[in-house]
């Protein structure tokens, strides 16, 4: 029983709410892309477009989310462009991860964030493939619950100029002006 309790403690993730500058998140994603794309045979271009805003969230979980999106994209060895852009939407920042190299039907996009045994195949021994979007969905759910403002969401849609986009929203850090200052 003690071992089970210790294992549960190790598996628990504590949500550490902090204020994170959006440019820092995107720079970390770009650095990660450069590191993992070295071994990819196809020529994939990754570009970022940021905003001068900060979000409220867990920096480690958000790095993991962006790394999952990059890993999933690079799993498909097709040349082309991937973009990560941001925009302000009221009290949220919308992150748009666009893979312009491949198309997905509306039906495929609707199923991305749900378990699918055909997609979740065993890659290397003991490692599941195709679970990246499920992990991203859980991270955004955690942010919706613990980041201090409800309304975080994640979804996928066809991209305007071809390909498809996964977008997610995080609460903007709204600076509070102190009275008398």
Where are these regions (language model features)?
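Conserved glycine-/histidine-rich ATP-lid loop and adjacent helix of the Bergerat-fold HATPase_c
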Residues: 135-151
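Conserved polar catalytic motif of the HATPase_c/GHKL fold
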Residues: 67-72
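A conserved beta-strand-to-alpha-helix junction within the catalytic ATP-binding
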Residues: 16-31
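Short, small-residue-biased leader/transition segments that mark boundaries at the very start
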Residues: 1-5
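Short conserved segment of the HATPase_c
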Residues: 104-118
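Conserved micro-motifs of the catalytic ATP-binding
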Residues: 10-15, 54-57
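Short beta-strand/loop element within the Bergerat-fold HATPase_c
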Residues: 81-91
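Conserved catalytic submotifs in the C-terminal HATPase_c
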Residues: 18, 43-53
């Amino acid at each position: 029983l003690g071992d089970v309790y210790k294992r549960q403690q190790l598996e628990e993730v504590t949500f550490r709410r902090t204020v994170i500058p959006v440019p820092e998140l995107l720079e970390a994603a770009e650095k990660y892309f450069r590191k993992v794309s070295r071994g990819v045979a196809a020529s994939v271009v990754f570009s970022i477009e940021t905003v001068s805003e900060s979000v409220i969230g867990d920096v480690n979980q958000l790095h993991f989310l962006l790394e999952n999106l990059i890993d999933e994209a690079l799993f498909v060895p097709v040349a082309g462009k991937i973009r990560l852009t941001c925009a302000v939407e009221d009290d949220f920042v919308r992150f748009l991860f666009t893979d312009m190299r491949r198309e997905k039907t509306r039906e495929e996009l609707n199923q991305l964030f749900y378990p699918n045994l055909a997609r979740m195949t065993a890659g290397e021994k003991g490692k599941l493939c195709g679970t990246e979007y499920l992990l991203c969905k859980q991270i955004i759910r955690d942010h919706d619950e613990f980041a201090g403002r409800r309304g975080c969401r994640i979804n996928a849609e066809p991209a305007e100029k071809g390909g498809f986009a996964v977008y997610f929203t995080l609460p903007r850090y709204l600076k509070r002006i102190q009275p008398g200052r």
